[in-house]
Design a protein with these regions (language model features):
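Hydrophobic alpha-helical transmembrane segments
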Residues: 15-23, 48, 81-85, 93, ...
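Transmembrane alpha-helical segments in multi-pass inner-membrane proteins
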Residues: 69-72, 230-233, 243, 247-267
Length: 267
């Protein structure tokens, strides 16, 4: 079998998986539309979008890592630390608010924490050349341990004007959380598909040697994908606190749903 045949086979397999996932989604949608009155009402659809905001944003971040590094377990990339990173950032945000710091300081600290974790992942993968699976697994354990240290393994309540806006704010009848998912996902799709950066990211993840031969700084794009993942985890941590009015242990349990949404979905 030629290289071209293998490439076509892999492409067809990937398309089949994605179309299959979409078909299942449509089937579930039709089932609930028939069985549950009001399921397709605007109020319920907006509520569904709001409920999936956190998972959706983290799933998009993981997808960017897959695009920029590939999905091969050994040669490709993955960010197993993304859920723990969001949990750590949420803990930092809630603790700072509880200690009297305002939204600007707490939010910057949360996002900064996420970016630092992303940088650590990227450094381990690009510079130290550690297998992404092992590198991000180690960082995941570090982030989870730091979260327990920061919160002392307790629920940390939080309230602020920003959290109130995210919780109860609405525009055109759509909640702030739903707008976060709509705007970020639209922007991400536009950047990944129609910008020079997005096309190069696809090139690096698809054929890294060819991308390197074309003069693309592959290490920079791989590092950037992990930093972006960390940035999104930091931003999403604020949304997590807004939904729960607290930072709670257990955010790392989102990892499997995030992986499923990234592997079966598409950007």
């Amino acid at each position: 079998m030629t290289t071209l045949s293998i490439s076509r086979s892999q492409t067809l397999t990937a398309m089949a998986v994605r179309l299959g996932a979409f078909a299942v989604f449509v089937a579930i949608l039709i089932y609930f539309a028939v069985q549950a009155r009001g399921f397709l009402s605007p109020f319920n659809l907006i509520n569904v979008v709001e409920q999936t905001t956190i998972l959706g944003l983290l799933g998009f971040a993981m997808t960017v890592v897959f695009i920029g590094t590939g999905t091969d377990v050994q040669k490709g990339g993955i960010d197993l630390s993304i859920a723990a990173n969001a949990g750590l950032s949420a803990a930092i945000y809630a603790v700072l608010l509880k200690n009297g710091h305002g939204d600007p300081v707490a939010a910057l600290a949360a996002v900064g924490s996420g970016v630092v974790v992303g940088l650590l992942n990227g450094f381990a993968v690009v510079r130290l050349r550690i297998m992404p699976l092992l590198a991000t697994l180690a960082v995941m354990n570090i982030a989870a341990g730091l979260e327990l240290t920061v919160t002392e393994n307790t629920v940390v309540g939080a309230s602020s004007p920003l959290l109130a806006l995210l919780t109860s704010g609405r525009f055109l009848g759509i909640s702030s959380l739903a707008w976060c998912l709509i705007l970020v996902s639209s922007l991400l799709v536009a950047v990944v598909h129609y910008s020079r950066t997005g096309l190069r990211l696809y090139a690096v993840g698809g054929q890294i040697e060819a991308a390197r031969a074309a003069g693309i700084n592959t290490g920079r794009y791989i590092l950037g994908s992990y930093v972006f993942s960390g940035f999104v985890a930091g931003v999403t941590s604020i949304l997590i606190v807004s939904r729960l009015s607290a930072s709670t242990p257990g955010t790392s349990l989102l990892l499997l749903p995030i992986l499923a949404s990234a592997l079966l979905g598409t950007v």
